[in-house]
Structures are given as C-alpha cells and as structure tokens.
Amino acid sequence: MGVYLNPGNEKFAKAVQSEIYVDKTGLIEYTNQVINTVQRYVCVTRPRRFGKSMTADMLTAYYGKECDSRELFSGLKISQNAVFAQHLNQYPTIFLNMQEFLSRSKEIGQVIDRVRRMLLRELKNSYPDVDYFDDTDLVESLQDIYAATKQSFVIIIDEWDCVFREYQQDKKAQEEYLDFLRDFLKDKVYVALAYLTGILPIKKYGTHSALNMFDEFTMLDPGPLAEYVGFTEQEVEELCGRYQMDLAEIKNWYDGYSFPGESSVYSPRSVVNAMRFRKIGNYWNQTETFEALQWYIDLNFDGLRDDVLQMMAGKKIPVNTGSFTNDMTTFRTEDDVLTLLIHLGYLGYEEQNKYVFIPNAEVQSEYASAVTVSQWGDISKALKNSADLLLSLIHISEPT
C-alpha cells in the first residue's frame, strides 16, 4: 500500500468503529452503476461538517486494491447489493487530499508539481516492469500502465476546490489548476471512476467549464444522492431513541435542508455532537463560520441586509441561482451571494419555488452573532437589537 496509490481502508475503519456511525454505503450503489461508463465522472459538493471526507475514505476502502475490505463492509447496506463483490477491492485507487498538497506549497505550480512527483514515485514502485515512454510525465505514465496491464484507476480527490478558496483573487492560479485536472482526467482511458468532492461546484469561466464531463450533485440539486447529503429523518429518529434526546429540539436546531425526494436533511456533525455530549447547542466552528458569514453579510449587495433581516424573522426570499460562477469572489448581484451561502450551508434552498431561507436555529445563531458586529450604518443599532432578541430566544430554547 502507498500513501496516495491504494492507501488502504484504515481511515474508513476508524469511522465505522466510532461511537456513532450512520451507514451511508448505499452511495456506492450509484458509483457502481457509473463506473467504467461515460458517466464515470462524479462531483459531489456539500458544506463543511457534512461528511465529504468520510465518503471519500469509504470509496477508497471499497474500490482500492492491496487491502481486503470484505469484513469491514460486512453488515453495511452495500454488502446486500448484487454487484457488491464484483467491484470490491478490484481497482488501483488514487486518493488525493488537495488541501494537504496546498498547505505544503507556496504557489499553485508547486501544488501541481508535488502531486505529479508523489504519484509518479508510487506508480513506478508499483509498476516497475512497465516500459515508460517518459517517466516524468504523469498522464503518459498512467497511459503506459493501462496499456501494459489493462487496469483502469479509480481516482478520488478530496477538497478538490481548496485552490478556489485559498487563491480567491488569483484567476491565473485557478485556471492553471483546472487545466491540470482536465489534462489528468478528461477522456482518459485509464479512468474507471473520477470522484471529486468539496464545497464549491466546478468553476466556470463564462459559459465554458474545463471539467464539463462531470455530473455534479450539489446543495442546489443533489439528485439521486440526496439521502447521502446529511442525516435523514429516520436516521435522526433512531439516534434520538438511542441517546434519549428530544427529536423536536434536534429538528429545530439541525434540520431544515430539503431536496426533492428527501424533505428533511440534518447537519450530520452537529447531530453527532449533540448525541455524544447530550447537549443541544451550536457546534459549528465559531471562528471560521462567524468571520466568513460576517464578510458576506457586509457586502450588502442589492439590499442584502434587508433580506437577511427578513430571513432572520422566518421569511423566505426568492433567488436566481443561474448566474453564480462557482467561486467566492465574483459577485454581480445579491443572488450570487445568496447562492454561495447555499453551498456553504448558511441557507436552505427550496428548489420548486426558488426560495432561500435560514434552515435552523443553529445557523440562525450564526446570523445573529454576525449581525451584532456588522457595520450597517443607521440600521446597525436596530439589527443589533434584533440579533440580541434572537440570541435570547435561542438560549431560552436550549435545554438546561
């Protein structure tokens, strides 16, 4: 086993062995349907704390060679599927967490170079007998391996969008990164399955996307993967029974996301923490969410401040998500900001009527905190008074 090539199943095993593990292996049924097909390119985006990395670890454990995951998946939902054994541990699997590469590099060229060098080292160690045309070229080396072995790869990229979050103002770096991914993945015979996961959908430049071969499943439309976005009503009911927690309180605090076919989706990490600690409260990362939310509120595009107030009062606001370009800086209208907040988990989205809203009390408390320190001129005092009242009501509703 390697670090990036066939890294094994240990990370997913730790998740399964945790005090609370909710079985989401049914998602593998979908990836098994599209593997080795034209639809083999899958991009799933969700907010932080919604289990993206665990899903990536699950797929790595299931598909990756050089480990035996049969016992690990025994008793889980996917083990009952007719083609479970057909794909289990059958593919050389590449797993990349782009945030790790980014944190060790000073600029995007170093990120890409490090990915190439690390993968090439492990590929050459695992396939020493392949006649490489150019063993310094990642794409050509993968093509040579496929030509020699007829084995195609499962490629899983976690935090795929970190470049767009860390290099928000550097369009050249973003384009260089997209070009690398396109060259690495698009129309390559050695790709059995490409699975990208992150927070932001795939970046678009004008009407063109460098990665337009991907099917995308987002907070706007997760399609057939809706039940895997977060915890479902049934899953939360079972946890509440197990931990003797009040379902109505849990629903008030952590529910509120909904999609066609899945009317109640809960924030998974918050539910897990509420169960483990037997305490309902705000489990979002305070510093990260507070600072980010405050910045977006203070942009105040097209009357955003008034709409935030209305949503804090329980109203729904119409939104047009079509113009959003899938980054964190290119805002032309209030709708673009609202759409980003959907992807970040700060807003729920009602697809049928095209409305956004604050999904639950946990997120409401983040808005209340952000508003209290925002500089909104003459209405700042009124906003702060409203926020103080909301915070008071939220704290009153907390169980003692």
Language model features: what each stretch is:
Residues G206-N212, F217-A274, D307-V308, M312:
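Amphipathic alpha-helical segments of the small helical/lid subdomains adjacent to P-loop NTPase cores
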Residues L391-T400:
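Residue-level detector of conserved catalytic or cofactor/ligand-binding positions
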